[in-house]
UniProtKB/Swiss-Prot annotation:
ATP binds at S39, G65, D66, G67, S68, L69, N70, E71, T95. It comes from Shewanella frigidimarina (strain NCIMB 400). Binds 1 Mg(2+) ion per subunit. Ca(2+) may be able to substitute. It is an enzyme of class 2 (transferase). InterPro entries: ATP-NAD_kinase_N (IPR017438), Diacylglycerol/lipid_kinase (IPR005218), Diacylglycerol_kinase_cat_dom (IPR001206), Lip_kinase_YegS (IPR022433), Lipid_Phosphate_FormReg (IPR050187), NAD/diacylglycerol_kinase_sf (IPR016064), YegS/DAGK_C (IPR045540). Probably phosphorylates lipids; the in vivo substrate is unknown. This is Probable lipid kinase YegS-like.
Length: 309
């Protein structure tokens, strides 16, 4: 078996993790070439990706959370088109790890590094948002405001699900955002409480926002929650659970592109990173990057074909 050369790009906050060090040493002793680079600030990722391409490293492993993965994807997309063949794997070390979790990637360090070395890579979609990119999900409105403005304890509390989210939206006196949303299916004008634009199935620390989403189908999965009154809460909760295409308050649909236009800045995050904006165009870039995934990953089109869905 030829020696495998990968490069681990490790979030600096995790540099003292003893388990990572021991796993890297063990894999090196097996004959694998594993370089390690440790980031100090977000700007380091662009340099690390550029250097990996220049050094002919075939595969990089992103050791961090969804934010680190987002940095890597944006850094790769800034490279010339022919260099997008650099393969990306992830060692999930963040708080949420939504993308990795949805893909069935383990948080056990040794086994995940072994997957990064031996696993197959697959072409997957990413989504362009104006001049930025994201791999997992964009959340707008109340959900993004919570992410940006509330402490960790409240974010953890929100992980309780739709009942908590809806209850807090009213308890906090949240005011919906009025604007327009346009897709290839038409334009919606009205008040939005929450909007989620998903490439993968979950976001927000384990909330299954788009259970039918696939990362290589050329589509983004959209969830929109319209303004509602206290009396409407039972209906809203039912619609959130039903994930129906036809509803009064909570809409779910798929599209290849989407544009938003709001008169005031809308709280928005891309893979958890804040990008408040008035206008933005979202567009799927089909099979734009190569990503290392476990066998039978539930987020690929082939998984639905095997299961007969």
């Amino acid at each position: 078996m030829p020696l495998t050369h990968i490069r681990l790009l490790l979030n600096g906050k995790k540099a003292t993790n003893v388990d990572i060090r021991q796993s890297v040493i063990a894999l090196r002793e097996q004959g694998h070439t594993i370089d390690v680079r440790v980031s100090w600030e977000s700007a380091d990722m662009l340099r690390f990706i550029t250097e990996a391409i220049a050094d002919n490293v075939g595969r990089v492993v992103i050791g961090g959370g969804d934010g680190s993965l987002n940095e890597a994807v944006n850094a790769l997309m800034q490279q010339p088109q022919q260099d997008h063949k650099l393969e990306i794997a992830v060692l999930p070390l963040g708080t949420a790890n939504d993308f990795a979790t949805a893909c069935g990637i383990s948080n056990i360090i040794q086994s995940t590094l072994e997957l990064a070395i031996h696993g197959d890579s697959y072409p997957i979609d990413i989504i362009r948002a104006n001049n930025n990119y994201f791999i997992n999900a964009a959340v707008a409105g109340f959900g993004a405001q919570v992410t940006a403005e509330t402490p960790t304890e409240l974010k953890d509390f929100l992980g309780g699900g739709a009942y908590t989210l809806v209850g807090l939206a009213k308890a906090l006196g949240f005011k919906p955002y009025q604007g327009s949303i346009t897709t290839d299916k038409g334009t919606f004008n009205g008040d939005i409480v929450v909007g989620a634009i998903c490439n993968n199935k979950q976001a927000g620390g384990g909330q299954m926002l788009a259970p039918n989403a696939l990362i290589d189908d050329g589509l983004m999965d959209i969830t929109l929650l319209k303004s509602f009154s206290t009396f409407d809460i039972p209906v809203v909760l039912d619609e959130i659970q039903a994930m129906s295409h036809e509803a009064k308050f909570c809409y779910h649909f798929q599209t290849r592109w989407l544009e938003i236009d709001f008169p005031i800045k809308l709280p928005l995050n891309l893979d958890g990173e804040p990008y408040p904006t008035k206008k933005m165009r979202f567009e799927v870039l089909p099979k734009a990057i190569q990503f290392v995934l476990p066998p039978n990953c539930p987020c690929l089109v082939q998984s639905t074909q095997k299961s007969g869905i």
